[in-house]
Amino acid sequence: FSLLRERKTILIYLLVAGIGGFVYAQFNYLLPLNMGALYGAEGAEIFGVMTSVNALVVILATPVVTTFFGRIRDVRKILLGETLIVVGLFCYRFVQGIIPLYFVLMTVFTIGEVFNTIGVQPYVTRRIPSTHWGRMNSIISIASGAFSGVGNLLIGKLVDTSGFDSAWLVIGIAGIFLILCAAAMCITDKKYFPLLYEKSTPGGTPEAFSDSEPESSASGSDK
């Protein structure tokens, strides 16, 4: 916990991981429920094709994103990824019954998934000492799992009582808050990890920084 006090922007990231886990979970929870309500048994077939599109876009987009967006800092990849995930999911609220747009939004969602995936792990390893990687990854997994688990229960009850439109609205509100948290993480990151911004390398990463203290903490100890 002393590590988190010294690197307060990591606390914001834990919030991003938690809310992001809740929003992302709707891909396998609220979305198939909605497809089933709209199309009955055929909804499972449509959702199956959507997941196939998801897998195909992951295969095609990952090398493209890695090659052409490699110099974007990991924290900005997370912001971009979470934004695309939110847009790709929440917009299903507005395209009910327009099947071709389902696949357009799934493509947007999946590209966001790719950006987020290639940004998250480097973000953690470059800002946390290697001695704490295991513990931090456990905390992140717990936060994400707790938010998604409790969130799915609440979304399920909301669907039963108020319908899918209200459930998607909650996802949209949570998504906006998620994007704001990710933006705040981008803003505060340079304050707590200035050394990461000193060299113009892919991801902005000086060597072996993950085992050092944030410059703001070090400068405070010299006074």
Write out the residue ranges for each language-model feature.
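Juxtamembrane intracellular "pre-TM" segments in multi-pass secondary transporters
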Residues: 1-13, 203-215, 220-222
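Pair of pore-lining "gating" transmembrane helices in MFS-fold secondary transporters
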Residues: 7-26, 107
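Short amphipathic helix-loop junctions that connect adjacent transmembrane helices
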Residues: 29-46
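Helix-to-loop junctions at the C-terminal end of transmembrane segments
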Residues: 60-74, 159-160
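Structural signature of the two symmetry-related core transmembrane helices
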Residues: 76-91
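Intracellular juxtamembrane helix-capping segments at the cytosolic ends
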Residues: 115-128
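A late C-terminal transmembrane helix in Major Facilitator Superfamily
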Residues: 127-162
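A membrane-interface helix-boundary motif in multi-pass transporters
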Residues: 157-176
